Regions:
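Extracytoplasmic "Venus flytrap"
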Residues: 40-63, 68, 79-89, 184-188, ...
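Hydrophobic alpha-helical segments within soluble ligand-binding/sensing domains
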Residues: 36, 134-176, 276-297
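C-terminal motif of bacterial Sec signal peptides marking the signal peptidase cleavage site
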Residues: 20-24
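Hinge/cleft segment of the Venus flytrap/periplasmic-binding protein
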Residues: 291-354
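An alpha-beta-alpha
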Residues: 43, 61, 152-202, 298, ...
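Bacterial signal peptide processing site
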Residues: 26-28
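Beta-alpha junction/loop-to-helix N-cap segments that form part of ligand/metal-binding clefts
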Residues: 79-142, 237-252, 256-261
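Bacterial N-terminal signal peptides that target proteins for export
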Residues: 1-13
C-alpha cells in the first residue's frame, strides 16, 4: 500500500513537470509569436547603380527602418544588393528575394522597380519603389493618387521647366543649349521632352548628345564643347550621374555650366543640381514600407509620394571656375527656388559637409 502511494505521487510529480515544460516551450515561441519577442519583417532592397544619389537613398531607407523598428518594437531584417545596371544580376537578386519569402521589396530607380513589378505579379509581395521619375509613364501605377495594384512608392519627378528658367536666369542671352542624357534611361524621357518643348517655344537651338556607357558620355561631353553650347541640361539620368566625376572638368574648363536634375550632380562637379532632397526621399520610402508592413496599408490605395522640386544646389568651386559671382547667381536664382544650398566637389555626401 505504501509503495502504491509513493508510485502515484511520483507519477503526479512527473506529469506536473511535463505540463510546466510544455508551457515553457509554448511561451518561448518564434519571432512572430506574442510576448516579448519582436515581430520580424523581411525586406529586400535592390539598388540600380552605385552613384551618390541612389546610395544616399539606400542609406536613409536603412537608417529610417532601423529607427522605426526601435520605436515600434519590431525588427526589419534587410537584405540589400546592387545590380550595377546588369539586367541578369538584377533578375537574380529579385528572384532570390522571392525565394527568401521577403515580406516587402524596395526597388531603387525605375529599371529595378519595373522588374520587381513583373516578377512579383503572381505573388502577394508588395513593392515600394524609390526615385522613379515618371511612375505612370513607366506603367508602375495607374495614377499617382491611386496606384491600383500591389506597387507604390516615392517619385523624384523633375520640373524641367524650372531648370530651364534657372539656365536663362543665369544667362538671358543663351542661344544654344545642350541636352546630355542616355536614351535608354526611362527616367530621362519626360524631362528631355519637356526641355525640348520649352526651348523650341523660346526659339533656342537644341544640341543633343547621348551616351549609354562612361566612354560614350565622355565623348558626348567633348562634343558639347566642340559645338559651343552655352549651357548643358542633364535630367535625373543614372548613366550620366555615374560618369559625372569624369566629365565635369571638361565642361567647366570650357566655361560651360551644367544644370542637372539632382544635388548629387553638383556634388560630383556640375555647376548646379536642382530637384528633390534625396535623403528625405529615402526616409519617406522607408515610412511607406513600414506603413504597409506594420499598419497594413494597401499599396493599391496608398498614393505615390511626390516632393518639392524647389531646392537648388550650387557647386561653389565650379561657380568660381566659371567666373561667376556667387551672390549675383544666387540672387538671380531666388525667384525660381524655395531654397539654395552650396556644396563642393566630392565623390559622396559623406565626404563633404554642405
Amino acid at each position: 500500500m505504501k509503495n502504491s502511494i509513493i508510485k502515484k505521487a511520483l507519477a503526479l510529480v512527473c506529469a506536473l513537470a511535463m505540463v510546466f515544460t510544455l508551457c515553457a516551450c509554448s511561451s518561448n515561441g518564434g519571432d512572430n509569436g506574442s510576448g516579448d519577442s519582436a515581430k520580424v519583417y523581411k525586406v529586400g532592397i535592390c539598388n540600380y547603380v552605385d552613384d551618390a544619389s541612389l546610395n544616399q537613398i539606400v542609406e536613409n531607407i536603412q537608417a529610417q527602418l532601423k529607427a522605426i523598428g526601435e520605436e515600434k518594437g519590431v525588427t526589419f531584417k534587410v537584405s540589400y544588393d546592387n545590380c550595377n545596371e546588369d539586367a541578369t544580376v538584377m533578375e537574380q537578386i529579385i528572384s532570390n528575394f522571392i525565394a527568401d519569402d521577403v515580406d516587402l521589396m524596395i526597388g531603387v530607380a525605375t529599371p529595378v522597380a519595373m522588374r520587381m513589378q513583373a516578377l512579383t505579379e503572381d505573388t502577394d509581395i508588395p513593392v515600394v519603389f524609390s526615385a522613379v521619375s515618371d511612375p505612370v509613364g513607366a506603367e508602375l501605377v495607374e495614377s499617382l493618387d491611386k496606384p491600383g495594384a500591389n506597387v507604390t512608392g516615392t517619385s523624384d519627378y523633375l520640373d524641367a521647366d524650372a531648370i530651364m528658367n534657372l539656365i536663362f536666369a543665369n544667362d538671358p542671352d543663351a542661344k544654344k543649349i545642350g541636352l546630355l542624357y542616355d536614351v535608354g534611361q526611362d527616367s530621362s524621357a519626360a524631362s528631355i521632352e519637356a526641355a525640348k518643348k520649352y526651348l523650341t517655344d523660346k526659339g533656342v537651338e537644341i544640341v543633343e548628345h547621348t551616351g549609354s556607357t562612361a566612354d560614350e558620355v565622355m565623348l558626348a561631353a567633348q562634343a558639347m564643347v566642340a559645338d559651343g553650347v552655352d549651357a548643358v541640361f542633364t535630367p535625373t539620368d543614372n548613366t550620366i550621374m555615374k560618369a559625372e566625376l569624369a566629365i565635369y572638368e571638361t565642361l567647366a574648363k570650357a566655361g560651360i555650366p551644367q544644370f542637372a536634375g539632382a544635388d548629387s550632380f553638383a556634388l560630383n562637379g556640375a555647376f548646379l543640381g536642382y530637384g528633390v532632397d534625396y535623403a528625405n526621399l529615402g526616409v519617406e520610402t522607408a515610412n511607406m514600407a513600414a506603413d504597409i508592413l506594420i499598419n497594413g496599408a494597401d499599396p493599391a490605395t496608398l498614393a505615390v509620394k511626390t516632393f518639392d522640386n524647389g531646392t537648388a544646389t550650387i557647386n561653389t568651386e565650379i561657380c568660381t571656375e566659371l567666373g561667376y559671382d556667387y551672390d549675383t547667381v544666387a540672387k538671380a536664382f531666388e525667384p525660381y527656388c524655395t531654397k539654395i544650398n552650396t556644396i563642393t566637389t566630392a565623390e559622396s555626401f559623406s565626404d563633404v559637409q554642405q
